[in-house]
Amino acid sequence: MLETDHSRNDNLDDKSTVCYSEKTDSNVEKSTTSGLRRIDAVNKVLSDYSSFTAFGVTFSSLKTALLVALFLQGYCTGLGGQISQSIQTYAANSFGKHSQVGSINTVKSIVASVVAVPYARISDRFGRIECWIFALVLYTIGEIISAATPTFSGLFAGIVIQQFGYSGFRLLATALTGDLSGLRDRTFAMNIFLIPVIINTWVSGNIVSSVAGNVAPYKWRWGYGIFCIIVPISTLILVLPYVYAQYISWRSGKLPPLKLKEKGQTLRQTLWKFADDINLIGVILFTAFLVLVLLPLTIAGGATSKWREGHIIAMIVVGGCLGFIFLIWELKFAKNPFIPRVYLGDPTIYVALLMEFVWRLGLQIELEYLVTVLMVAFGESTLSAQRIAQLYNFLQSCTNIVVGIMLHFYPHPKVFVVAGSLLGVIGMGLLYKYRVVYDGISGLIGAEIVVGIAGGMIRFPMWTLVHASTTHNEMATVTGLLMSVYQIGDAVGASIAGAIWTQRLAKELIQRLGSSLGMAIYKSPLNYLKKYPIGSEVRVQMIESYSKIQRLLIIVSISFAAFNAVLCFFLRGFTVNKKQSLSAEEREKEKLKIKQQSWLRRVIGY
């Protein structure tokens, strides 16, 4: 299934289209780094080494081994990520810093937002696996610091360093599968690294309960420590088939040398060119913008008084100014902007970026306090609430597998994106209906299943459309942009949900239960669940309060889901083929064919 047509290498120099002039094509060739040329050479070996047939589909043996290793790596790093996310609460609590968990999550989101594009650019220059090893070093150092630190500041630093490595794994896995797969199989291939979510969703909770808790307060250190061993071993399994393919390519004389600098360049010139290649100034401006805008949202936490404090206002104002400077830099001065200028006129990329942001934002608003709502308003246990809250990730991954297989035989990704976007609105509507215990937990579970299926139909098929709109040279960079926007949507959604929750819930509880009890329940709702079981008068008032706030959250989520459904109609409905990427001529032919279709076919994408 994961068969790539290597004729794309000849198509990169195509100069026959109107839109992509001879100058543009020469720029593409010029910008093809030694890392990308090495990637192409290794991919050819991976595809041509040997093959076998199963289920009527031809598979490359070495490529299949690499993808199986990628699956194992995804299982180990995914499990480590889920466990780290859970035990950081226990770790912070052991240092008496439980209230700082929100700040940790915000900084992690910012890190994940800003490192994706630099990782993509560096991997284009030096190679995917070479960059993967660099990410592994950061990940392992972060895990070691987190496991051994005697202070909370050390824990914070370790978690942030670990996030630098983990975010690299996510980007590089997607870029690697993009290198190895044709567009028709891209949706399925991109999900290989995330398929283990299907398993980890159900086992991570049991592992967390065994390495964290009150019985052994510092046992959480093992939750970090064991992955200092597991992840490097799984990485070795991933590296071996790729390095073997590199060796075969080198032995045949087809592996280009890795150029760290051009002939005649000084060290200073080399470093300056490297800074230009990864758009270092843009990265710094983008990072500062996110920190100064998103961090105040977390610090203020929706409390009106804090929004009026000088340092909050100053951070937001300065952040907004830096955001404006960042836009000017990207449009006027950056030699290698985040969005390559050759694609500035392509609506598919902008619509996809906006959809990625809007869908994740609306989804995070719904998910942010779902565990608390399940325990307070539905009477679910901690383990049950955690598993229900993970249904989205589970169903999204399952749906990605099915959609990925279907796209191999029906190569029209936009159809699935449109269907998923409309289904997402229906799912959010069901969540609005089934939001308290009186409506039944089965209804809420059903609604979460619908939303999860919708997410699986939207994300990777939409990414496939974006990949069809770009060349291989820019594929990793555009993927990094999509990942960055995803994380920004996640952070903004959490901030909006926190603002609504903080400003409205306390007032509701105080109005219904009085100042003393209302504030006590607001601060620690889980401490009162056994004292006031479902059916008691106090619990009834708690359920009514939480139901009212959940209603507001779902209304906001529905609004964003509806906006996402409108946006999906503006994507270009490319028909994808077995090539790694479309040539400029093929893209222009596809655009012309789409223009000649009826308006209904253009909107739906079939």
Curated annotation (Swiss-Prot):
Lumenal side: 162-187, 246-279, 332-337, 382-390, 433-435, 502-550
Gene Ontology cellular component list: cell periphery; cellular bud membrane; endosome; endosome membrane; fungal-type vacuole; plasma membrane; vacuolar membrane
Segments on the Cytoplasmic face: 1-140, 209-224, 301-310, 359-360, 411-414, 457-480, 572-606
Any single biological process term in GO: transmembrane transport
Keyword annotations of the record: Endosome, Ion transport, Iron, Iron transport, Membrane, Transmembrane, Transmembrane helix, Transport
Coiled-coil region: none
Pfam short name (any one): MFS_1
An example Gene Ontology molecular-function term: ferric-enterobactin transmembrane transporter activity
Subcellular location: Endosome membrane
Membrane topology: Multi-pass membrane protein
InterPro entries associated with the record: MFS, MFS_dom, MFS_trans_sf
Record function comment: Involved in the transport of siderophore enterobactin and so has a role in iron homeostasis.
Entry similarity comment: Belongs to the major facilitator superfamily.
Protein name: Siderophore iron transporter ENB1
Organism encoding this protein: Saccharomyces cerevisiae (strain ATCC 204508 / S288c)
